[in-house]
């Protein structure tokens, strides 16, 4: 994981330049690549849910250790890495409904889902609804 504290953000969601840069801290943590494992090392596929569970806890722990009360999380590898949205959502939900329940003031999930089925979005909505 990489913590990049107090980085200036120069543009808004539409790509327009902000009048004044906003400061934000970023935690970079790679998602396991289910697709690569399936194609090249299928013996490792059963390890992925535990890796997701453990890494998601590390991300939350690092955020809390640095006093971040508001966090934005993503659909960790549910696109090109082909991670199962239900597994990823449950990895985060297990912590946010358990040990980390009520520890953050605000948690947002940025979930890009342009499919007609909205399977990825629905998986996160279903898993995290109880954490709201």
Pin down the residues of each PLM region.
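Macrodomain-like recognition of ADP-ribose-binding/processing modules
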Residues: 1-132
């Amino acid at each position: 994981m990489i913590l990049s504290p107090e980085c200036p953000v120069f543009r808004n969601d539409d790509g327009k330049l902000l009048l004044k840069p906003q400061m934000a801290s970023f935690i970079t943590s790679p998602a396991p690549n289910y697709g690569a494992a399936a194609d090249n090392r299928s013996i490792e596929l059963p390890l992925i849910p535990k890796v997701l569970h453990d890494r998601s806890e590390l991300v939350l722990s690092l955020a809390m250790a640095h006093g971040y009360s508001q966090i934005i999380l993503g659909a960790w590898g549910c696109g090109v890495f082909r991670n199962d949205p239900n597994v990823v959502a449950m990895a985060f939900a297990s912590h946010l409904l358990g040990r980390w329940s009520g520890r953050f003031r605000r948690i947002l999930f940025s979930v890009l889902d342009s499919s007609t089925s909205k399977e990825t979005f629905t998986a996160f909505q279903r898993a995290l609804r109880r954490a709201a």
